Amino acid sequence: MTEAVNQSLTSDFTPSCVAETPLLMRLSPHRQGKRAVLFDHFMKRLIRHGTLHVRLPQGDLRSYGTGQGPVAGFSVRSHAALQRLGLNPALALGEAYMDGDVLPEDCTLHELLDLLTLNLMQGGAHPAEKALEWVRWTKRRLDQFNPAGRARRNVAHHYDLNARLYALFLDRDREYSCAYFQTGEENLEEAQAAKKRHIAAKLKLDRPGLGVLDIGCGWGGMALTLAREWGAQVTGITLSAEQLAVARARAEEAGLSRQVRFALMDYRDWRQPVDRIVSVGMFEHVGLHHYADFFRMIRRVLKPQGVALVHAIGRADGPGSTNPWLAKYIFPGGYSPALSEVLPAVEKAGLFVTDIEILRLHYAKTIAHWRARFAGNRDAIASLYDERFCRMFEFYLSGAELAFRRMGHMNWQLQLTREQNALPLTRDYIWQAERQSVIRALGVGGIHSQSPPSP
């Protein structure tokens, strides 16, 4: 079924097909020509590296760029899409791909987006994009107002999708966040297990029974790991009813329901003191206006000798705004902050920053694994939703990978304490704890070397 749909969508688009579209029948050749001129002007400014071939709705083939380097192409199947691409490409390209109005030609979607991203990063920004930037800057201040009610709706938009969807492209533990590649050769399961070990080591879980709060616990993978492998007493909180049901079922199945509990709760409502706090992939949904609330909450409930670890997506180029397509279709209210926007709130909360680690290309590798698994299970995913949904997710995953590979996005891990003496003076305890975790998993006793693992 999916193969037939794809074949029909990628067939040659002739002028006779265009004439059958009611909207286009109402357009004069003059108006169609103006739209083509606007689009042509945009593409000439954008493509300065490599070559891009574009087939216009009337069948004309245009080529842009240097004629050297990477090559990609796409067809535009309607003049309405052509106009939207000329006026607001950041939103229109994804929408046109979802609707079948833009189709890659002689390349994959990922290759097409890679060439476009390469040119955007080389200074080929659309003039309208620059003009709209101040509007987006203002709008993001409103979008980032994220009280409890809106936060629940925003989370439900993406995370309350059918649980089977995520099982079809994530790892077995359903870790929907950046993995940790120590060599770059790990498979997805190995890299996600390494991520959990790395975070657990930074939490310094040096004795069983420590109380841990997992803010934004997802499907429970981190909480269950901390309980099973480190003896922690964990409470995971989420705003997703779908994730909550899966996490509780997993705890019951693992025989850990007395050691791990999950609740549908906003982080602002938590009151009980805890020894450790972990938050992985949730901070992007907090909202700029609420950073102070978030870190004050950590300061309030963390015990004096406690440790907190926040793992989130960030940007290296300073404050910005969320891509409009991503904000509309994938993560409403979401924002990946620069550390310069985060650290002032940490300081005002009275917390010590004891460690900051930047994970640069780790998320690009993670999403590449997700893309491959999504493609391998595309028919099954289409049976859960439809072709348009699959196109939306393909566009999202390809764009996200390129943001981390080419556009300065990265992950950061921020370790925080209330007291200066809560942790050892050096970071040696981190690699030692990771090594001990690996040895336990292999069933080997004792540490045979005091050298840190290779980076």
Where are these regions (language model features)?
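Substrate-binding/catalytic lobe of Class I Rossmann-like enzymes that use SAM or dcSAM, i.e.
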Residues: I313-P424, W431, V438
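Conserved beta-strand signature within the Rossmann-like core of class I S-adenosyl-L-methionine
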Residues: Q305-I313
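Conserved class I S-adenosyl-L-methionine
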Residues: P208-G216
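Conserved SAM-binding loop of SAM-dependent methyltransferases across substrates and taxa
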Residues: W219-W230
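A short glycine-rich, Lys/Arg-flanked "PGG" loop and its adjoining helix->strand segment in the class I
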Residues: A292-P304
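Conserved SAM-binding loop
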Residues: A247-R248
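A short acidic, Gly/Pro-enriched loop at the edge of an enzyme's catalytic core
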Residues: R268-I277
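Feature captures hydrophobic
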Residues: T2-A193, H198, L205
